[in-house]
């Protein structure tokens, strides 16, 4: 197959998306950017350079209208594929496929459906308001996914209630057949009227809690540019990103070389692969093996559920004992030695690792020690780690969080409410939050908020000179802070120190790990006319 570059693929996906978005709008359907594509729109105004795909979503009502409109008026050389239209297809969500191209995926390239260059379309299913009914619906949806997908095992969480329903459903399937079991699960999972719901569950590859979306976060949608195409995004798109990626979504990941496992061709239709190559493959045998192995994997999950959680719990004990050997957490109110910090870090890293997360296992370290770890991580700015350990603690123990942990959690939430308001460029909200939460905000976020407000209020040269002086003072307390230096550079540009401003902004663009700061610095250079100077 002919080679193509990532830029070729991005250009192809963008053309597909623009065509489909225009079609959707013409048919009174709203699809919005999601996952890495939404993150790219907000942080890069386009594709994330190290990403590989394009993701969009639709609420349940829009999704149903989309499928109906497609049946009546499809786009040429395109197909929408999912388990309902293509029996045996392994995904609950849909894909928009370009049938003039080829994209061979491990599980779906068996002539089950057209398999070309594609865009994921994730439907958002309404969830019940009642907490118990909501959990029941989420479990039913996960088990429904497991029993309709005969190719891949869900690698996400295995909480007890979901395992119980899976075991019960497998027994019922042997007795009553698959059709009845799936109908029962479908009724539980998909029966909540959208007008009555306050949250959705997003149908991705079988995910659980991380994909619950509050209805008010979606709101009435906004539009942001994605590679120049104005696109729908959730009204509270920053909170949406926080729910999916954590509070540090603004930062670039340390590993930007994500794996890629597809074979693609932009010029050869998938039919050519089916007719010319699949004749050498035993399709029926492979699909039969998939079903056999999937059934064994489900039984294996249920068998391991009696052993693996306890094994995880046991494996956490050495890290727990190393922490507890330091005595009582109350002894370290005035300071924590490095070896205790290291022991707490090791325990938390082990606790939030994939296997304890998968089985919802808690290693037993007391809340007092967890509170101490949270305070240490807070001082280091490791906010995602704190939120992960708090989430794991909440999932695993049916007990309310103590005040000592809630205090740290509330501080983090207060900090990021301010940063969210700054990124929304909502000066009134920033002022309100600073007045409301000033007592719990740390010095750095207070400094960022003050410089933001002073910059928004600045009009003449004297105002900008005051901003520059405030930034210089702040840098004495927080040397090398990218956001403070950016505010300083903008102030310098307004008081005639343009060469310094240009160099500072260029340096921030090159070195900063905060994508929103980089984006703002690029905008600053353009708005201040500094790009034209170089």
How should each PLM-predicted stretch be described?
Residues 2-27, 67-134, 139-245, 250-297:
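Conserved catalytic core of two-metal-ion nucleotidyltransferases
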Residues 397-398, 442, 479, 513:
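Short coil turns that delineate tetratricopeptide repeat
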Residues 368, 412, 446-450, 483, ...:
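Start-of-helix register in tetratricopeptide repeats
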Residues 21-54, 58, 63-64, 216:
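Active-site nucleotide-donor binding segment shared across nucleotidyl transfer reactions
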């Amino acid at each position: 197959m002919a080679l193509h570059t990532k830029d070729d693929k991005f250009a192809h996906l963008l053309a597909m998306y623009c065509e489909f978005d225009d079609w959707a709008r013409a048919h009174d359907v709203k699809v919005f950017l999601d996952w890495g594509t939404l993150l790219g729109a907000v942080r890069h105004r386009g594709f994330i350079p190290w990403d590989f795909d394009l993701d969009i979503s639709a609420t349940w009502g829009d999704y149903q209208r989309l499928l109906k409109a497609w049946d009546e008026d499809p786009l040429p050389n395109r197909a929408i594929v999912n388990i309902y239209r293509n029996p045996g297809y392994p995904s609950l969500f849909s894909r928009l496929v370009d049938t003039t191209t080829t994209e061979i995926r491990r599980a779906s390239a068996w002539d089950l459906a057209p398999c070309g260059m594609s865009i994921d379309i994730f439907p958002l299913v309404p969830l019940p308001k009642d907490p118990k009914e909501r959990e029941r619906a989420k479990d039913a949806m996960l088990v429904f996914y497991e029993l309709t997908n005969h190719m891949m095992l869900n690698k996400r969480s295995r909480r007890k209630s979901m395992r119980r329903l899976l075991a019960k459903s497998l027994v019922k399937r042997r007795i009553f057949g698959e059709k009845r079991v799936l109908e029962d699960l479908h009724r539980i999972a998909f029966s909540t009227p959208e007008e009555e719901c306050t949250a959705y569950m997003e149908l991705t590859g079988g995910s659980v809690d991380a994909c619950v979306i509050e209805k008010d976060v979606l709101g009435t949608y906004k539009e942001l540019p994605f590679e120049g195409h104005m696109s729908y995004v959730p009204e509270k798109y920053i909170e949406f990103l926080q729910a999916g990626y954590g509070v540090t979504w603004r930062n670039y990941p340390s590993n930007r070389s994500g794996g890629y496992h597809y074979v693609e061709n932009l010029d050869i239709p998938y039919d050519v692969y089916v007719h010319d190559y699949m004749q050498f493959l035993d399709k029926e045998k492979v699909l039969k093996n998939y079903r056999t192995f999937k059934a064994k994997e489900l039984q294996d999950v249920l068998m391991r559920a009696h052993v693996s959680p306890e094994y995880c719990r046991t494996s956490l004990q050495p890290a727990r004992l190393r922490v507890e050997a330091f005595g009582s957490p109350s002894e370290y109110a005035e300071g924590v030695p490095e070896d205790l910090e290291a022991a707490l870090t090791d325990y938390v890293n082990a606790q939030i690792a994939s296997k304890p997360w998968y089985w919802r296992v808690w290693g037993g370290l007391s809340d007092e020690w967890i509170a101490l770890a949270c305070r240490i991580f807070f001082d280091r700015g490791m906010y995602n780690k704190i939120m992960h350990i708090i989430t794991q603690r909440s999932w695993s123990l049916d007990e309310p969080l103590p005040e000592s942990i809630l205090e740290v959690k509330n501080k983090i939430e207060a900090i990021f409410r301010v940063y969210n308001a700054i990124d929304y460029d909502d000066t009134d909200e920033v002022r309100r939050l600073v007045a409301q939460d000033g007592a719990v905000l740390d010095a750095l976020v207070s400094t960022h908020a003050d410089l933001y407000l002073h910059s928004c209020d600045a009009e003449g040269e004297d105002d900008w000179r005051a901003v520059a002086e405030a930034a210089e003072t702040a840098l004495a307390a927080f040397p090398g802070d990218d956001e403070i230096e950016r505010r300083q550079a903008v102030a310098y540009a307004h008081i005639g120190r343009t060469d310094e401003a240009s160099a500072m902004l260029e340096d921030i663009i090159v070195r900063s790990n905060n994508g929103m700061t980089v984006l703002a610095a690029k905008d600053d250079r353009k708005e201040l006319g500094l790009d034209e100077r170089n």
